[in-house]
């Protein structure tokens, strides 16, 4: 008889699935396709079907590689013809469901009626016609979340973006009320260069107020693994580019719906680039503790603050029941009536569809559905902002209680990131030096390749192999270019005439103190004819201790003929003492340790205080069972320990007086590890070098430091500053932070009179702690989405640094810079000179760049006390927000500031 009266309604086949690929064939014709991201359809049945004709349907589903696939649901929806007032009551069942979900009631005498009878249908229709429309409303606009890479390579992203953008523009022509929002300046830049005609259409739609660029950083970046300098560049590049391309909009948004957590310092960085609003959805993924707010003021350690919005789900359709549930959830948390809805296929692009817009139009006339209106994100935020002083304040990081393995997966990406960032900062500093000396410094460093690779599925290591294979030449090319640019600029700097120096050492960071100890080609080395302390290196060349330096500086080096000599006494030279059979004590007056073939047995500070309660432990565990394999560390990994086999081999490589270097070996299942311990003269930390041939899968390798003195607090650097946490968790949220990302250091802080142990890192790592230990995750072995993610050779460095007092007064953040970036040598001449003055140990340099009036210096006061900086004779300083210069200024605790350094002459 047909599905319904052909003149009163028609039907849609409604499907939802979980599949790598979905294809729907009707009578041999492909009518719909989907995947893991486009997971539902509402296909309209053809006219002949409504007349009773049969359809030959074939549904093709392909399971994902990492999971079982499924056809989740399949049913028919009946709808009135477009423009029809639904005289047959086709929508009554769905309308009644909406009415009840909005706390409505059933018709009077419902219990006495037959639910399937005509009388019941008439009673429902009358009851719903008389009922009030649900309280509340929704602002809606189309959206298409698009990951720059993930389960597809970057080249596919450009194609997906083009399809999405063309589709959105075509829909705008058919649906005059449609507004569409999209993010990512890097995408718009590609479109402008490679699809100029399409970009011109986007610009026209933007000027008409229908295309809304919801940009923020250059890409939707990772926000817990990148340094402060990179995060600053992300926002600065993104905001500047957005203002240039779309001047008709104000650009005050940080649109980051899908990044894996947000560092406590992000408000300071974003606010400094003009951002006022932060928007995300990701905290809805919290596994243990639902995030309590939907709109709030996020306050950093300093005085910075962002208005913050927890977005509705991304990638949704226009189901009126889902929209009602979102509005009710919003109202319950915020007390506000008007909510936001951003429908559109996401992750791999797509955006809104005709089906979606038809569904919105269908329910606009129904009194049981929420009132909706098309608008923009900025209109919604402006409305919210009227009552922002009543919002709750959040004074913490926005920790994602999921994806705790991202800091450890794919360490090669983290290594590339830290190396390229260092080279870019050095190139920028060299440009500032040229500007100070009156040389040409007009060219700027290209940060865009680095910023692109910091996307939240590339840097964390959570993409398919092709993404990383294609990223490798990008990393290498960008590193080579930054290296060449840095050296080219340094070569232009003035140097004394007639200098005999043929090498030079550069320390471009303005640290309080440098004690350079470098390995140079074999020979006898001197500075300005003054011989230097030297030691022949076991692996070739000569260890040379340079004079102490301060600030940004350079040291000319002269290589003479002959062998290295120890005639010059070293500062805090290394002394090795054999304590017994196979046990040695090594020290330099600042730190000492005991070692045997069993490993690091003991560690002491300069006063002889023990730092370890037992030997350093190398631990290996099974890491299996989480759905998001590359993302998530198994919650129960400590319940599944695996073995580590010592080889009883200890081999000395260097034995002082400048460097003591020894090597141990360990067997880790099918993998092997070489652990080097190295202590340098006049250095307050012990360096550990882990060289690992990793062949394990679904395992985690960790270092564990048992502390001799209980910790009460843990400090660690984070994007935009420093965060401190209790050593023992108290609240449920603190218990959920059992593994966290750290960028370059973390430190235990003991009770009064203080002191503790700092672990200095060569790049981001996952770490954990308690009051009696510190732990570092070295390697994992996930197999999805990259089957060989962490396999192969890895070299990772870290250092153990005991300290007295607080980590801030001990200069731990600057020590981490000195460990990670110990300066560099180049076969070119230079002057013996301090180019820029030194910062106090309590201040951490972030970046140095050329400025019209001098040198732009960004820095952080990471500690808990105010710090005064007096650059010294010949220098003045001012804030970028103030035109008056001064000989000194005070930096408040937690402040991230931009200063202009000028020569007083």
Model-found features: residue ranges?
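Histidine-centered catalytic/metal-binding microenvironments
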Residues: 83-140, 144-150, 421-525, 529-532, ...
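Catalytic grooves of carbohydrate-active enzymes
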Residues: 145, 149-151, 303-498, 665, ...
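Alpha-helical scaffold elements lining the catalytic groove of polysaccharide deacetylases
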Residues: 223-244, 311-331, 636, 640, ...
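Catalytic domains of cell-wall/extracellular-matrix polysaccharide-remodeling enzymes
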Residues: 246-292, 350-359
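Aromatic-lined ligand-binding clefts that engage carbohydrates, nucleic acids, or primary amines
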Residues: 3-28, 57-59, 506-508, 518
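C-terminal (or distal) subdomains of carbohydrate-active enzymes
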Residues: 266-271, 285, 292-295, 310, ...
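CE4/NodB-like, metal-dependent polysaccharide N-deacetylase domain
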Residues: 231-265, 272, 326-340
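N-terminal catalytic cores of secreted or lumenal carbohydrate-active enzymes
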Residues: 14, 24-233, 242, 425
